[in-house]
């Protein structure tokens, strides 16, 4: 596969567990309804080896709904990636979990360039609890101070924060942006929320802090560009064509235990799924209202 035909990164879901209950995320609705899983380490390695053979150089551990740092094997995975030919690693986390073993793995990154994105909202104790659904504001702020030391001492590790705006802000978001600057983190504001393909439409519209902040939907004219850019291998080894919002696996076209990702990426199933975007009747259900959709 030529480098121009490779996805921007291969996404790997190493766990399906999250430790926050964000009001703008679908995770709280499914928490407790499915068994907690962690990707088997041999499967994880085989997925990366296959991707490297294709010429792949970038991995993301951002799942659809979960937090990579809750994965009990995350430190081992970071060590493995750092020892592999993978050049770049990135993923998003709420950064509630920053256990000593994870901290050590961050400190020891010496080969792979690693950029962690931290997604959060509610920039004081009270608003954080209301919007992130857990009382972990102080813990996250302390974890960020620890991360700052690593970012400033290890040039392979960088961090950026996505600061999600909300109604009722009394200046705390700007103070958080200053905190980022002072601690060596990049940051940007996110003004809008999406509805998880319509699954969260009522929740977002009716939330006093988020209402009126829904991302615009684009008309479906061509295959979604995400199908070219963000393939996800789930904790069970399923190849899900979209990393973004496919909570229930409607866009799964195979499993890497049966067929390697390298074959599925150039196979007929992927092309057939993309073709479904040309007709409203065949458009996957989850894609019909998705605000993450961008035509390729």
PLM region spans:
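Conserved alpha-helical substructure of the radical SAM core
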Residues: 1-115, 126, 130, 134, ...
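Short, electropositive alpha-helical surface patch
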Residues: 75-81, 120, 169-187
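Conserved strand-turn element in the central/C-terminal portion of the radical SAM core barrel
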Residues: 89, 144-172
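Non-cysteine beta-strand/loop elements that form the S-adenosyl-L-methionine
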Residues: 111-123, 187-194
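C-terminal accessory region of radical SAM enzymes
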Residues: 145, 149-158, 180-219, 243-295
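Short, small/polar residue-rich loop motifs at catalytic or cofactor-binding pockets
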Residues: 224-228
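Short, acidic, Ser/Thr-enriched surface-loop or helix-capping motifs
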Residues: 233-236
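Hydrophobic "anchor" residues
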Residues: 238-240
């Amino acid at each position: 596969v030529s480098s121009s035909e490779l996805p921007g990164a291969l996404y790997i879901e190493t766990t399906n567990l999250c430790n926050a209950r964000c009001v703008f995320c679908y995770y709280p609705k499914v928490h407790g309804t499915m068994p907690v899983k962690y990707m088997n380490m041999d499967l994880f390695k085989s997925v990366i080896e296959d991707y490297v053979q294709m010429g792949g150089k970038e991995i993301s551990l951002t799942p659809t709904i979960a937090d990579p740092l809750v994965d009990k094997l995350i430190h081992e995975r970071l060590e493995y990636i750092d020892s592999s030919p993978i050049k770049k690693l990135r993923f998003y986390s709420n950064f509630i979990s920053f256990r000593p073993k994870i901290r050590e793995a961050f400190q020891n990154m010496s080969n792979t360039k690693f950029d962690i994105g931290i997604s959060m909202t509610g920039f004081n104790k009270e608003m954080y609890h209301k919007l992130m659904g857990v009382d972990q504001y102080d813990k996250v702020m302390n974890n960020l101070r620890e991360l700052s030391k690593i970012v400033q001492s290890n040039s392979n590790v960088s961090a950026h924060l996505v600061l999600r705006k909300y109604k009722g802000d009394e200046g705390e978001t700007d103070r958080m942006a200053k905190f980022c600057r002072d601690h060596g983190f990049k940051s940007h504001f996110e003004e809008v929320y999406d509805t998880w393909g319509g699954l969260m439409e009522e929740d977002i519209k009716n939330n006093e802090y988020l209402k009126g902040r829904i991302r615009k939907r684009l008309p479906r004219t061509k295959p979604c560009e995400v199908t070219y850019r963000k393939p996800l291998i789930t904790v069970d080894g399923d190849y899900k064509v979209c990393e973004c919002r496919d909570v229930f696996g409607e866009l799964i076209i195979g499993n890497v235990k049966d067929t390697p990702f390298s074959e599925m990426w150039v196979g007929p199933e992927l092309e057939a799924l993309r073709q479904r975007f040309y007709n409203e009747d065949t458009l996957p259900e989850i894609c019909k209202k998705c605000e993450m959709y961008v035509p390729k």
